[in-house]
């Protein structure tokens, strides 16, 4: 109580007393007359993100708020913390103050996209009657989730002034729903001696929180099969971009002394892309085969009708995108010409419309198009569900990535039933600032139709000569360096309008 009394009126609007957080603490008499805070927050910080910034943020938040409402994700997992707090809130259901805390509760998560996705997944799994909306502090490298909802891309300051400024934004932020996407992979149980469990990069032991085999008692389990499940909010990718991301993570773990600054990291990323065939297709890189060789792709629209999706043989990476920010704020979907949009039956890419945008890339040079005004990848489809049916014997493994978390996925060569399916699974609440780039289908301020002031691209064949891309840009910025020290999980979508301040050359690979 002493600390609460010493706080400014502003900070009191975020403060949660300990008795609300823990069953082991009793309410003090003075707390009975305390006004309910306008924006009570639980703060989760990945102390390994952003170099030393995560640890510094923990110290600042704990100095400003109740020490017990600020959590270090390296010490406590969010599922255990939230279960404990919500069990206590249930115990206090007849306490009017605690009830109002529960109704007004917000979550702040500081880390990279994987950390933010981790919190999103936990909140979804809890199936709360009043799920708290989430604000994201950009502490990673790409910071796609924070950028999509107006929280910025740059790592924040960690002093009192910076933290109070962020809290003020949280106080004013609006709640926006975004779609959850569920991913299911099923295959026959491998013969003795073979394992098809996902293989995480060496330095990401938590990354498979996002994608794991279901237990024998899970309703999704099927006898005679291995079933894996996961979820994402921003994107799922299959193919070369995931392969390079995986290689980068593994290389950094083996030789950390080589990854001391951003420029060296980016050069290494490019080198890995070259050696593995991402910049130039090669007969010597069978793992870089195109998507059509790996799998048959089907999509379903809202009416539930499945249809084959034609994938050009030049496409070697496919991205299923929900938010307007990919690889550090780039927009692979772009802004289709209105006439051609109508001809193809496309709709604006809202984050809560139950549709996901499917985009393809030929190689890293193709990705350079995103740096140009109106640049975009190959727009393949919008879908409510998408299914990949892997061809028997096509490969013994592939690479996948969800919201910045890559893994190597072994595949049985003698199985013709390997299937990955992505489907819509509810929504989660995000906090968005006035700079939010994501658009809601239910927001009256969101334009339903593109107008003449919008910049459109007429390049609907989704292609630019690779030589022209090289001549204009000289380097690829498509697939950014992933977050260091990330835990794991899920989602983000691409902005309807291009960011006019597209990355400076310091960010180009």
UniProtKB/Swiss-Prot annotation:
Residues 439-452, 468-489 have a biased composition (Basic and acidic residues). It comes from the Eukaryota. Residues 439-509 are annotated as: Disordered. Residues 453-467 have a biased composition (Acidic residues). Residues 36-187 form the DAGKc domain. SMART domains: DAGKa (SM00045), DAGKc (SM00046). Pfam families: DAGK_acc, DAGK_cat. Residues 490-500 have a biased composition (Basic residues). One of its GO terms (molecular function) is ATP-dependent diacylglycerol kinase activity. Its EC number is 2.7.1.107. Transmembrane segments: none annotated. GO terms for biological process: defense response; phospholipase C-activating G protein-coupled receptor signaling pathway. Keywords: ATP-binding, Kinase, Nucleotide-binding, Plant defense, Stress response, Transferase. The keyword Nucleotide-binding applies. It catalyses: a 1,2-diacyl-sn-glycerol + ATP = a 1,2-diacyl-sn-glycero-3-phosphate + ADP + H(+). Monomer. Belongs to the eukaryotic diacylglycerol kinase family. Phosphorylates the second messenger diacylglycerol (DAG) to generate phosphatidic acid (PA), another important signaling molecule. PA is required for plant development and responses to abiotic stress and pathogen attack. May be involved in the accumulation of PA during cold stress. This is Diacylglycerol kinase 5.
